[in-house]
Swiss-Prot record:
Record-given protein name: Cytochrome b
Binding site for a ubiquinone: 201
Membrane topology: Multi-pass membrane protein
Transmembrane segments: 33-53, 77-98, 113-133, 178-198, 226-246, 288-308, 320-340, 347-367
Other comment: Heme 1 (or BL or b562) is low-potential and absorbs at about 562 nm, and heme 2 (or BH or b566) is high-potential and absorbs at about 566 nm.
Assigned protein family: Belongs to the cytochrome b family.
Length: 379
């Protein structure tokens, strides 16, 4: 009699995806983040679902409903802070996951990579809309500033912004639709994750050497299930430390003030995970230029497979490319810091230099250094 795991149609999919999946024997902990992202998504959907049971998406009651969740709902404060800090963990894992892909050349699986970039956009959109829902000062003004950027689009911009707002300013209609989309998008993301995995399982995983590992594969379970559980324990530990000891560390104090259209906060800034993009947006003293730079800062990931000039896939054996990669990481940290600073000297020029360096590394320096490395190795 055949094992039900291998014969039952639904079980077969799970068996082939998480149990008998052939995986390279040498993938490091950098390959943990895929499963961690899946767990983050599940956690966000669950906590979000329970929060939505008590939240009201009306400008008059939104702020108070969030306060009510924290004060009156059983363990409502745990739900809220798990959801808010879970988003931070989600983005930490996302950026590490993308960084791993860049370092080890995983982007050569173009279908998987492109679906991943679309997923990144979808998660960023979801997080932005979620930040608007508590209807604090930073929620309101963040929504106003970011949606207003669309008015830079020639000809249709102004009408587009009013259409998104559902009126002449960010108001009740805006909040209601943001809640609707914030609820809907994670389920679309879940479906896209399945497409992401479908494309990945067509090729199998990459590995740190960037050399095909078809001759040395091991089953996913028990080796990588156990390895992933270690990563999960570490992530849950960090998340619980955040939630239980300093739940507001990554938030903005301004968001504890109810939204007031008549009073602008002195420094409007997004959550920490958008600060690098915000710095790139602000570094260009032109509205349309800034918006284009903002979109391109993420969209540039799509063309990375086209910019790969090296004969080697991974950066593991390319010290010059490694130096550039870590320079890029340092540059992103710099821009994250700049995004949270006021628009004044010397922050303006630092932000502009960081933005120029960001695009230069990806478009010019990386391909050129890879090309030079080929010649150094006489390839």
């Amino acid at each position: 009699m055949t094992n039900i795991r291998k014969s039952h149609p639904x079980m077969k999919i799970i068996x082939x995806s998480f149990i008998d999946l052939p995986a390279p024997s040498n993938i490091s902990s950098w390959w943990n983040f895929g499963s961690l992202l899946g767990i983050c998504l599940a956690l966000q959907i669950l906590t979000g679902l329970f929060l939505a049971m008590h939240y009201t998406s009306d400008t008059a009651t939104a702020f108070n409903s969030v306060t009510h969740i924290c004060r009156d709902v059983n363990y409502g404060w745990v739900l809220r802070y798990l959801h808010a800090n879970g988003a931070s963990m989600f983005f930490i894992c996302l950026y590490l996951h993308v960084g791993r892909g860049l370092y080890y050349g995983s982007y050569m699986y173009t279908e998987t990579w492109n679906v991943g970039v679309i997923l990144l956009f979808a998660v960023m959109a979801t997080a932005f809309m979620g930040y608007v829902l508590p209807w604090g000062q930073m929620s309101f003004w963040g929504a106003t500033v970011i949606t207003n950027l669309l008015s830079a689009i020639p000809y249709i911009g102004t009408n587009l912004v009013k259409w998104i707002w559902g009126g002449f300013s960010v108001d009740k209609a805006t909040l209601t639709r943001f809640f609707a989309f914030h609820f809907l998008l994670p389920f679309i993301i879940s479906a896209m994750v399945m497409v992401h995995l479908l494309f990945l399982h067509e090729t199998g995983s990459n590995n740190p050497t960037g050399i095909p590992s078809n001759m040395d594969m091991i089953p996913f379970h028990p080796y990588y299930t156990i390895k992933d559980i270690l990563g999960l324990l570490l992530m849950i530990t960090v998340l619980l430390m955040l939630v239980l000891f300093s739940p507001d560390m990554l938030g903005d104090p301004d968001n504890y003030t109810p939204a007031n259209p008549l009073n602008t906060p002195p420094h409007i800034k997004p959550e920490w995970y958008f600060l690098f993009a915000y710095a790139i947006l602000r570094s260009i003293p032109n509205k349309l230029g800034g918006v284009l730079a903002l979109v391109l800062s993420i969209l540039i990931l799509i063309i990375i497979p086209l910019l790969h000039t090296s004969k080697q896939r991974s950066m593991a054996f390319r010290p010059l490319s490694q130096c550039l990669f870590w320079l890029l990481v340092a540059d992103l940290f710099t821009x994250t810091w700049i995004g949270g600073q006021p628009v004044e000297h010397p922050y303006i020029i630092i932000g502009q230099l960081a933005s120029i360096l960001y695009f230069s590394i990806i478009i010019i320096l990386m391909p050129x250094i890879s090309f030079a490395e080929n010649h150094l190795l006489k390839w």
